[in-house]
C-alpha cells in the first residue's frame, strides 16, 4: 500500500484573500525598488521596463486589475469587461442582460498545477490525501482530466469534505486499486477553550478498507500556523492534544492501523506538538532510515529539522502508528519542479503578475507499507 499526502493549496482557483495577506509587504518592497531605480541617472532599457512593471503593481497604471468586472451577454455568450469603460444601456431587448459580479477568486497558473500532478504521478499512490481543496467539482475535474491520463486511469473513489473555512477550503481523499472508502467522521463541530472552531478546516477521519479486508484510519489535518502578527502555539497545542485523543480512542477500539497526515504548523520538537509526538505512538516518515528526497537537487541526509529548496519539511508530516511504521519499506518526499523566473533585482527578484503571485510549490510526502 502506498499513501501520499500533499497540501495542494487549491487546484484551479484561489481566494483573493491570499493575495491581500501580503499586500502591504509587497507594496513596501515595490516602492523601495521603484525609488532606487528612479535615482539612477543612467537607466538602461531593462530598468525602464522594470519601472513600468512596478508602476502597474503599485496602481499607477490604468491597466491595473480591478476587483469588479462587468458581465455581458452577447450572441448567447457571456463577456466581461473592466469597470470604468464606456457606459452601457441596462437590460433591453436589443442589448440583452447586463450585470456585474464581484471576483472572489483568481485562476492558478497551469505550470504550478502541472508540477503538482507530476509529483503525484511519480508517487503513484493507492491512497491520496489532499488538504486545501476548493470544492468537489474541482476535485472531480482534477481527478479525471489531470490525474487520470498520468496514472493510466483516474482514482475510482474520491471524497471531498468541506470544513469551517469561510473560503470553502476542505480536505479530500482519493483511492484506487481495491482500496475503498467506507467511513467518514468529521470534527468540524469541535470547539476550543474560547468557544471558537478548534479546526479552521476540519480534521476528518477516513476509514479505508484494504483489498485484503483490513481496516485503516486516516486523519487529515491542517493545524494553525503562526502568522506575522499572531502566535497560535496555544491553539496548536490544543489541536495536538485532540489529535492524541483520537489516537487513544482508536487504539482502545483495537484499531492500530492509523495514519495522520497534513500540516501541523510546528517543528517536531516544538512544545505545541508534545501532546501528539512525545510518547511516539505515531512517528513521522522523515525519521525512517529509508526516507529519501527527490526534487530539483537531491540532498542526502535530509531530516525533518532541515530545509530543502526553501521548504521546511518539519511543518508537513506523514505520521504512522507503530504497527504501520514498522511496515514501511520505502518513503520520501517529492518536490515539484517549477521553472524559476529570471532575477531582476534584489528586492523584487522575480517578475510578478498581480493575479499570479509567486508561491512556494508544496511538497508531496509518501510512504510504501509492506503487506498492507
Protein language model annotation of sequence segments:
Residues 1-149, 159-165, 364:
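N-terminal, active-site-proximal structural segment of metallo-dependent hydrolase catalytic domains
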Residues 2-4, 192, 198, 249-259, ...:
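Metal-dependent phosphoester-hydrolase catalytic domains
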Residues 2-5, 126-131, 173, 217-220, ...:
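Structural recognition of the beta-strand scaffold that forms the well-ordered cores
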Residues 9, 134, 222-224, 264-267, ...:
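Catalytic metal-binding/acid-base residues of hydrolase active sites
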Residues 64, 127-217, 221:
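Structured beta-strand-rich core segments of catalytic domains in phosphoester-bond hydrolases
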Residues 135-137, 166-168, 226-228, 265-271:
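Active-site environment of divalent metal-dependent phosphoester hydrolases
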Residues 230-256:
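A long, amphipathic alpha-helix that forms part
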Amino acid at each position: 500500500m502506498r499513501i501520499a499526502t500533499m497540501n495542494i493549496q487549491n487546484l484551479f482557483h484561489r481566494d483573493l484573500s491570499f493575495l491581500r495577506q501580503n499586500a502591504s509587504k509587497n507594496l513596501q518592497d515595490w516602492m523601495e525598488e521603484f525609488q532606487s531605480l528612479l535615482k539612477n541617472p543612467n537607466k538602461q532599457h531593462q530598468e525602464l521596463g522594470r519601472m513600468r512593471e512596478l508602476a502597474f503593481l503599485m496602481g499607477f497604471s490604468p491597466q491595473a486589475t480591478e476587483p469588479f468586472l462587468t458581465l455581458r451577454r452577447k450572441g448567447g455568450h457571456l463577456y466581461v469587461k473592466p469597470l470604468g469603460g464606456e457606459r452601457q444601456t441596462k437590460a433591453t431587448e436589443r442589448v440583452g442582460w447586463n450585470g456585474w459580479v464581484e471576483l472572489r477568486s483568481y485562476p492558478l497558473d497551469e505550470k504550478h498545477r502541472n508540477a503538482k500532478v507530476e509529483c503525484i504521478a511519480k508517487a503513484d499512490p493507492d491512497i491520496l490525501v489532499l488538504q486545501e481543496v476548493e470544492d468537489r467539482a474541482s476535485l472531480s475535474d482534477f481527478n479525471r482530466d489531470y490525474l487520470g491520463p498520468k496514472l493510466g486511469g483516474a482514482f475510482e473513489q474520491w471524497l471531498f469534505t468541506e470544513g469551517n473555512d469561510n473560503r470553502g477550503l476542505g480536505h479530500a481523499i482519493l483511492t484506487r486499486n481495491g482500496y475503498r472508502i467506507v467511513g467518514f467522521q468529521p470534527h468540524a463541530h469541535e470547539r476550543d477553550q474560547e468557544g471558537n472552531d478548534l479546526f479552521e478546516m476540519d480534521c476528518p477521519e477516513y476509514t479505508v478498507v484494504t483489498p485484503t479486508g483490513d481496516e485503516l484510519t486516516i486523519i487529515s489535518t491542517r493545524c494553525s500556523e503562526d502568522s506575522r502578527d499572531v502566535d497560535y502555539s496555544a491553539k496548536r497545542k490544543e489541536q495536538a492534544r485532540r489529535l492524541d485523543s483520537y489516537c487513544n480512542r482508536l487504539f482502545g477500539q483495537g484499531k492500530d492501523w492509523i495514519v495522520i497526515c497534513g500540516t501541523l504548523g510546528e517543528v517536531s520538537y516544538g512544545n505545541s506538538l508534545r501532546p501528539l509526538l512525545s510518547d511516539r505512538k505515531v512517528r513521522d516518515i522523515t525519521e525512517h532510515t529509508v526516507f529519501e528526497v527527490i526534487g530539483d537537487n537531491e540532498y542526502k541526509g535530509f531530516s525533518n529539522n532541515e530545509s530543502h529548496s526553501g521548504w521546511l519539511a518539519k511543518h508537513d508530516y506523514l505520521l504512522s502508528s507503530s504497527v504501520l511504521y514498522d511496515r514501511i519499506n520505502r518513503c520520501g518526499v517529492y518536490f515539484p519542479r517549477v521553472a524559476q523566473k529570471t532575477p531582476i533585482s534584489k528586492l523584487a527578484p522575480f517578475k510578478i503578475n498581480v493575479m499570479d503571485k509567486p508561491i512556494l510549490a508544496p511538497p508531496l510526502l509518501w510512504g510504501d507499507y509492506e503487506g498492507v
